[in-house]
A protein has these predicted regions:
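Amphipathic alpha-helical "coupling" segments that flank catalytic cores
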Residues: 1-181
Length: 181
């Protein structure tokens, strides 16, 4: 799904479709290594080094470590096109997947860090001054899950994710003392 989403987003971001799809397809490859299994904080970091040792281009390798960014509300963002595109599609894929099975954050619990993912998507778009058709990206992500015959428990996923993103956007604006009107 990440590979297909990255290809879809590449048109909006005007980046090389084939390269970003390669980056997406190897973005999680280090998660099955014993080292990352033992030291989860090395996810992405080791992926970058594994990719470099396998001869992948530096910008593709960097996207593996950078796509986990941002880690919080004020932390560093991915700044390179492959990195921020993989970061956006990874976070969209997670949001869509969890919303499809009705695993949404509540006022007191967010065990899958979906609020952080949503804020990350918005910060990446805003701070990198990107033009992304989020509605289209979310719709395409839902279709990819449907094609895999994933049991969909929530038929309102697209609307709910857009509302969820709007609420996170309100929070971002509030923190920056920008009026919502």
């Amino acid at each position: 799904r990440l590979r297909q989403l990255a290809g879809f987003l590449s048109d909006d971001l005007n980046i090389n479709k084939e390269k970003v799809q390669v980056a997406a397809s190897i973005s999680k490859s280090d998660l099955c290594s014993d080292l990352v299994g033992e030291y989860p904080e090395l996810q992405g970091v080791m992926g970058k080094y594994f990719a470099l040792s396998q001869g992948f281009e530096e910008e593709v390798a960097n996207s593996i470590s950078d796509h986990y960014l941002p880690l919080g509300l004020t932390s560093a963002l991915p700044k390179k096109p492959f990195s921020y595109s993989i970061s956006i599609v990874d976070k969209i894929d997670s949001l869509v997947g969890f919303f499809l099975i009705n695993e949404k954050p509540t006022s007191s619990k967010d065990p899958f860090a979906l609020r952080r993912a949503a804020i990350g998507i918005l910060r990446i778009i805003i701070e990198n001054k990107l033009s992304v058709k989020l509605r289209d990206l979310i719709s395409y992500s839902v279709r990819l899950y449907e094609e895999q015959e994933i049991k969909i428990e929530n038929k309102n996923t697209e609307i709910e994710i857009l509302d969820f993103l709007k609420e996170r956007m309100r929070n971002i604006l509030k923190l920056k003392n920008i009026k919502i009107d």
